[in-house]
């Protein structure tokens, strides 16, 4: 019953809204239309911000925290990078290539480049409309909070809760439960391949260790400060080393990505829609731009200008997809296709790592995925704080209850089928994006006005 409901909503969001009469027919979903519209609108209105103001984005990350409360710019980037790098760059890229082929990688790049401007706008708004957090200290915010402000403006009075804000918060909690399932599903599969450990045993150990960390009130940020930089650098160094070792093969891989991206073969077979759809879906799941996840961390930063936090999160999108996602994609695509035929999920990635590094590769990717998964789980629970508070008020019982639900979803995910687990995450992130866009479209001018003011002040300095 529940699986059927998830699949029905999934088809509504990601199924074909209409068919373009090209080749065998190209299916375009509602979510692709929505993201494409935002991807065209926001970069043009920010005048290609990632290109023009890249140096400012770097400078914003390096700024020190302005006060004692809240997080630094670097800490918010670490939290958002934890969820992006954790599942998006490993499991997300694997899913895109498994379902959409090499061409899906190109559409992930496009989603990131267009999404950086979207991330700037949503994170700037989150910083502008943040609120004090009486439970954890510091600040909290995100789309639920600026959706609430928008609803109060339209109604002309103070509201206890807004329907659209509550729907976003609920969608976020659903999505993050889905991500919890993806975590345990992928880790248990990787450990079964690497160490022949039964999925149930891996899942129970993973859940127990996660419980020790997350049931402590303020352990999340401290844990991520240590874990994320170390593991991201290690993974990046090893994957770049593999790519450089296989440099002569890289032109052929790039040719395959671009050839399949534009459907020169796929359009004839009617498969271009699958390439585009999987690239966009996994790109959104990876970099989170427009979904409203990262603004939940952006709101918590101590920052003297909301625009700077927009810069930080826009940079995070580029780091995630253009740099690290590409490394994972190249790892798989540098392997001869006949060796990975018929493989999907972590089986595909581990086979690729075995090809490059021998038996050590299987162990390396299993351990790396486990560490990344912890960072992702901690990151999404940090995102959930403000949304749980919006729905249930400021109390510890609701915060603890959601953490327990997420831990239960870890257990369930380890036992579920690969596709069912991804469907729940896709449903949640799709709904989040829809409700977030309901605020971004009418409120984007506020972020753009702040950007113009920032650039005017910069010229006077």
Label each PLM-derived region with a short phrase.
Residues 38-43, 114-139, 148-185, 189-213, ...:
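Helix-loop-helix module between adjacent transmembrane segments
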Residues 67-99, 125-128, 135-150, 163, ...:
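Alpha-helical membrane segments and immediately flanking helix-loop junctions
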Residues 45-50, 89-93, 176-188, 211-223, ...:
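Transmembrane helix-loop junctions in multi-pass membrane proteins
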Residues 1-87, 97-104, 115, 439-461:
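N-terminal alpha-helical transmembrane segments of multi-pass membrane transport
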Residues 34, 38, 42-45, 49-58, ...:
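Membrane-interface loop-to-helix entry segments
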Residues 114-122, 202-217, 228-248, 281-284, ...:
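Selective recognition of specific alpha-helical transmembrane segments in multi-pass small-molecule
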Residues 122-134, 240-256, 270, 300-301, ...:
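Extracellular/periplasmic helix-exit of transmembrane alpha-helices
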Residues 48-72, 95, 101-102, 117-159, ...:
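Flexible loop linkers connecting adjacent transmembrane helices
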């Amino acid at each position: 019953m529940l699986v059927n409901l998830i699949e029905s909503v999934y088809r509504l969001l990601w199924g074909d809204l209409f068919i373009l009469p090209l080749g065998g027919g190209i299916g375009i979903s509602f979510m692709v239309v929505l993201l494409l519209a935002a991807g065209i609108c926001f970069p043009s209105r920010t005048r290609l911000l990632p290109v023009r103001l890249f140096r400012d984005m770097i400078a914003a990350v390096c700024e020190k925290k302005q006060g004692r409360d809240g997080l630094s710019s670097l800490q918010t980037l670490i939290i958002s990078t934890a969820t992006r790098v954790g599942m998006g760059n490993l499991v997300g890229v694997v899913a895109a290539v498994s379902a959409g082929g090499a061409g899906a990688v190109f559409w992930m790049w496009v989603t990131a480049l267009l999404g950086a401007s979207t991330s700037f706008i949503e994170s700037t708004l989150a910083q502008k409309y943040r609120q004090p957090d009486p439970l954890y200290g510091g600040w909290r915010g995100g789309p639920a909070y600026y959706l609430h402000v928008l609803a109060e403006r339209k109604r002309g009075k103070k509201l206890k809760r807004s329907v659209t804000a509550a729907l976003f918060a609920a969608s976020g909690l659903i999505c993050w439960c889905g991500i919890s399932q993806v975590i345990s599903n992928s880790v248990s599969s990787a450990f079964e391949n690497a160490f022949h450990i039964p999925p149930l045993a891996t899942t129970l150990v993973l859940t127990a260790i996660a419980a020790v960390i997350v049931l402590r009130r303020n352990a999340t940020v401290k844990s991520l400060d240590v874990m994320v930089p170390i593991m991201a650098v290690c993974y990046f160094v090893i994957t770049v080393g593999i790519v450089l070792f296989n440099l002569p093969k890289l032109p052929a891989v790039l040719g395959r990505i671009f050839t399949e991206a534009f459907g020169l073969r796929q359009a004839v077979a009617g498969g271009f829609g699958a390439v585009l759809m999987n690239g966009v879906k996994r790109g959104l799941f990876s970099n989170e731009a427009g979904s409203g996840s990262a603004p939940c961390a952006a709101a918590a930063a101590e920052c003297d200008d909301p625009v700077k936090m927009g810069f930080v999160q826009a940079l995070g999108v580029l780091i995630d997809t253009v740099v690290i996602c590409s490394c994972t994609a190249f790892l798989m695509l540098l392997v001869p296709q006949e060796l990975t035929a018929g493989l999907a999920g972590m089986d595909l990635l581990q086979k690729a790592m075995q090809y490059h590094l021998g038996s050590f590769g299987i162990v390396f990717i299993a351990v790396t995925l486990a560490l990344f998964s912890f960072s992702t789980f901690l990151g999404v629970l940090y995102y959930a704080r403000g949304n749980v508070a919006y729905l249930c008020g400021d109390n510890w019982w609701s915060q603890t209850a959601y953490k327990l639900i997420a831990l239960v979803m870890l257990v369930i995910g380890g036992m579920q089928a690969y596709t069912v687990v991804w469907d729940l995450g896709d449903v949640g992130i799709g709904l989040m994006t829809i409700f977030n866009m309901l605020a971004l479209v009418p409120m984007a001018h506020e972020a753009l006005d702040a950007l113009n003011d920032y650039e005017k002040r910069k010229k006077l300095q």
